[in-house]
Regions:
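Bacterial Sec-dependent N-terminal signal peptides
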Residues: 1-57, 61-64, 443, 468-472
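Acidic, low-complexity, intrinsically disordered peripheral segments
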Residues: 24-26, 441-472
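Bacterial Sec-pathway N-terminal export signals of envelope proteins
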Residues: 47-93, 97, 103, 253, ...
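Sec/SRP-type N-terminal targeting helices
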Residues: 68-72, 85-86, 138-165, 215, ...
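Periplasmic alpha-helical coiled-coil/stalk elements that build and connect Gram-negative outer-membrane
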Residues: 79, 165-278, 393
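Small/polar, glycine/serine/threonine/aspartate-rich low-complexity segments that form flexible
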Residues: 95-132, 310-346, 470-472
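A short glycine-centered flexible hinge/capping loop motif at secondary-structure junctions
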Residues: 207-211, 418-422, 459
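Short terminal targeting/anchoring segments
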Residues: 215, 420-444
Length: 472
């Protein structure tokens, strides 16, 4: 090996800096590759802002447009409660009427006291009235039930918001993990490009001195060009992923962002506590079941009589000429009347309307219970599958990581042998291809492992830990 090294130095004095200190630089290269492996990168510009997963989650929860709509719906449902509560309060209305009886009606009364069988009286042509009317329910079971229904609907609105918030946390986390995986891929491709550029320089030097064929130089250039295309594609993909992330969290589109690097040595496994009994999917269905049961009660309460308090204060005037409204005197006199009473409403027959509504509600209740059973079994299946996937993905991740490191070592050995003139260019390129494949498998296994971890956090009810105790 030393003779080969001396031979190279003597034949290629111009390339002495490339070959003479190779073994002295080997440790430094490995250190650089380790940094590339873990995805450590320096932001390309001062304008880039590095966002952690926790930053993205907090920003998204506060600013996501769809979640803001859900938040407004939650606020709106509170007014529905006040709206139904207002039905229990007195309702006071002011009314006014004016009539022009151009063909006045008549009033017929007993006229025997006047020597006539009937006494016919004509109504004056013009009359007007105005005043106030009062109505207040004293007992109306339907109104009481509708108030309790509005409270359940408010609860459903709150649960819908919390579920949308949880779904947003999952969406942002998956997008963040995907962006981290692409960033990690870029770092590995960049390190591979550096390796091939060094190999190209060595091969070019060999070719210039008659120790390699032109086809070897072309092979390296082809692989180098392919890697550059992969790098450009990954860079474009990362840009799209970051743009989509900014859209989801409603981050200013003109600002440049970067993600924190992945720490593959510090992945916190989820605590497998079993499927949570407090998942929003189940709580929503339970609240909807309660809603349907109360709606059934409200239909049944429609058969119960209702009692209301009524009252009025009215002023009425009559005249035979329109101009008298603007004159004082007997022809423009207003008569006051007032009263208070009770109004009882007893339902007797509604054409079987409530009966049909009750049957529909029974079917809705049966359907919601079937949906509960289906959702429960579905979530249980998801949990079992996710648990199996977690173990499998964890095992695959460790294997692919070992394979990646092993493929890198094999490539380094083959590169050394090529520099010494022992291995062929074909062997180097084959090992480089195997190393690239191992890198891609490693990145894919890492991403799958993290996503499975995320799914189990959701199913076990621990998704909120991402906001307070997450690891990037």
């Amino acid at each position: 090996m030393n003779r080969n090294k001396c031979y190279v130095n003597s034949v290629f004095p111009a390339e002495r800096n490339t070959f003479a200190c190779y073994y002295e630089k080997k440790d430094m290269k490995k250190l650089l590759f380790i940094f590339a492996f873990f995805g450590w990168s320096i932001p390309e510009g001062n304008a880039q802002e590095i966002l952690t997963l926790e930053n993205c989650l907090q920003w998204g929860i506060k600013n996501n447009l769809s979640l803001q709509t859900q938040r407004n719906e939650m606020r709106k449902s509170k007014f529905t409660i006040s709206e139904n509560r207002a039905k229990l309060l007195p309702q006071i209305n002011a009314i006014a009427n004016f009539n022009d009886n151009f063909d006045p009606p008549v009033s017929v009364t007993d006229g025997s006291s006047y020597g006539n069988p009937y006494n016919v009286t004509h109504t004056l042509q013009y009359n007007a009235n105005g005043g106030f009317q009062l109505q207040m329910p004293l007992y109306n079971q339907t109104v009481y039930t509708s108030l309790s229904i509005s409270k359940v609907m408010n609860e459903i609105s709150n649960l819908s918001y919390e579920k949308a918030r949880e779904d947003l946390i999952l969406q942002i986390s998956k997008m963040y993990y995907l962006g981290q995986a692409t960033t990690e891929q870029l770092s590995l491709i960049k390190a591979n490009i550096a390796r091939l550029e060094e190999l190209r320089n060595i091969t070019q030097a060999f070719f210039d001195n008659g120790m390699a064929m032109e086809v070897d130089v072309k092979r390296v250039n082809i692989n180098l060009e392919n890697l550059q295309v992969q790098y450009d594609n990954a860079q474009a993909m990362l840009t799209q992923q970051l743009n989509m992330l900014k859209y989801v969290i409603d981050y200013p589109a003109e600002k440049e962002i970067a993600l924190t690097p992945v720490d593959t040595e510090n992945i916190q496994p989820v605590n497998l506590t079993g499927l949570s009994e407090n998942l929003y999917e189940m709580r929503l269905l339970q609240s909807k079941e309660t809603l349907i049961e109360k709606q059934k009660k409200m239909i049944a309460h429609g058969y119960i009589p209702s009692l209301s308090l009524t009252g009025n204060l009215m002023f009425t005037a009559f005249t035979d000429k329109f101009g008298n409204w603007f004159k004082s005197g007997p022809s423009n006199r207003w008569y006051r009347s007032s009263g208070i009473g009770l109004s009882l409403r007893v339902p007797i027959f509604d054409g079987l309307d409530k009966r049909n509504k009750n049957k529909k509600a029974q079917i809705d209740l049966a359907n919601i219970r079937l949906a509960q059973e289906n959702t429960r079994k579905n979530l249980q299946t998801q949990y079992v599958n996710a648990t199996n996937d977690l173990m499998n993905n964890q095992r695959n991740f460790k294997k692919q990581k070992d394979n990646y490191l092993l493929a890198e070592d094999v490539y380094e050995v083959t590169s050394d042998r090529y520099r010494e003139g022992i291995a062929s260019m074909t062997e180097v390129l084959q090992d480089e291809m195997r190393m690239s494949e191992a890198q891609n498998n490693y990145i894919s296994a890492h991403y799958n492992y993290r996503v499975t971890n995320l799914t189990l956090l959701k199913l076990t009810g621990q998704i909120e830990t991402l906001l307070t105790n997450q690891k990037d």
